[in-house]
């Protein structure tokens, strides 16, 4: 009896010890973009925890070798890790595989060797396994590649010897559309479901959602986000909208409920972004969360977050699939964060709101031909995770010498409430064009029901400009090129060719000193970085732009001016705009009182913010006695059972670990370049790692080409 008691006591002690001691599994993958198909950005890993995170050190670095010298390349990839191998993409969108323990390269694939333009943005890759066969899918420009995941060689039985064109099947003359895919597709059985990036001007192609056979590359189904005749939502557009309008695309990824066979797809705005007089109506399915049947592509439900968008309020990230406890019941739901700083929480099965959502009146437009939608949806809960308006009272006084000029500017532009329509007078859009929330996504902890979200609180300035008619009296090709430039290029590169303040779009007033004429022509044709290719522009119009940029005095016959000057938007859109301009001081700081970047914890069961802290720091301001301001940030968080949140994203180029319960910053490490990507975490042979792409290249910071992995000693 005594022996039995001793044995029982020993057994209880062992069980108790196992319960209290946190154990990391031998091998835990990060097999899908953002961690899993439900986009939770969550890992059941706890070897690295609040007790030991300060001991975290770099254990390997992998250099891709192709960062740009002009600090304009980026690396936004969230790498996947499967069975000890990490797969990702480089600044020039080369796919690679490395050993996840050592960082040693296994193979690399260069799409440029296969006639694919590879200088757009890539956020990752998609893995599919059928028996022993392992395949990797990724897009470079408009080409979707299928590779042998073990060798990096193209799979000849997929599409056209290993690739398919994402331009095919869009519309007649689809080869002229700018099409790319910046975010990985998602796998359901033998399907890979893909969205695309398209132009944001009136030349945009349609944003079809398509499912391809993962074995053959054949198109299995297509969902028209601009409905065709007879399809649901057709009446929310002009009758011929499906033939001539574009956008309403899904560029930011998607989430999948495999048990229900439902895929949840966030969509962007219709094109042109800031004037919709030629697309009057509610514009379904732009700015929607779409729930589709994964087998057939049929619509199950939708929820539109912005009606008739005029503010470039694309849904920037895939929804998190979550479970909400409400009124004593557990409800399978989703949460969708927006650039506006709002969070929509919907029933996953029906699309019905979990918390009330109210349609509120918004201001009317005074632009020619435009008709704004009368109301917009505002969630009552959760409360916004950013401020919702900016007035002159919100200007900080860190640099008193600018007070008069800032107040003068504030008195001349429209501001002070959400959904102020674009105008020739100018407006402040807040939160800005890059959120609020952005493409890095949010981390959801299924154990606590807490959502962790990083956000920007940056005001941007915006002004519409009436398009000038061409000067038919000129005999210089450069004069025609100037008008074409202002219509197609000035929104990003500036009305005076000055570029943007952060360096994302370079100045062109010195392009003669930096690039050869043929190099500029290649970029116009194919695009580079954030710039799309301009395939829709006639060759004569491209020559006119080049004549303008290179100060050429080529003369043309007056009768040719009108033909060359039939610009893409003229007669379609009567306005262009001054571009995407952050409202910054000359020193580069936002003009609004901090915080400028935040990390928040939102209790999704209550619909309440549990805590919010600044994300990032300007050390020079902190030394002046100014509290941490936070910084603009890109890339998202991940959360673990070790009670930690890991996030890079901030302009100061640190990766950080926060206590998920309190928001306390526990650890930070200065990266070789900005970690403007969502990190991944995984375990191999019982050792947990955290890895992040350090591509930099945003917010005026240097570009990089390194992946850095961290672990405990």
For each of these PLM feature ranges, what is it?
Residues 30-34, 72-92, 118-143, 177-201, ...:
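Repeat-blade elements of multi-bladed beta-propeller folds
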Residues 2-9:
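Sec-dependent signal peptide recognition
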Residues 180, 262, 475-479, 483-486, ...:
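Extracytoplasmic electron-transfer domains, predominantly the class I c-type cytochrome c fold
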Residues 15-17:
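C-terminal motif of bacterial Sec signal peptides marking the signal peptidase cleavage site
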Residues 23-66, 81, 600-602:
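Mature N-terminal segment immediately following signal peptide/propeptide cleavage
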Residues 22, 37-44, 67-71, 96, ...:
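Short, solvent-exposed loop/turn elements at domain surfaces
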Residues 53-65, 95-115, 144-176, 208-244, ...:
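Extracytoplasmic/lumenal domain signature
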Residues 36, 393-407, 411, 417-422, ...:
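Periplasmic c-type cytochrome electron-transfer domains
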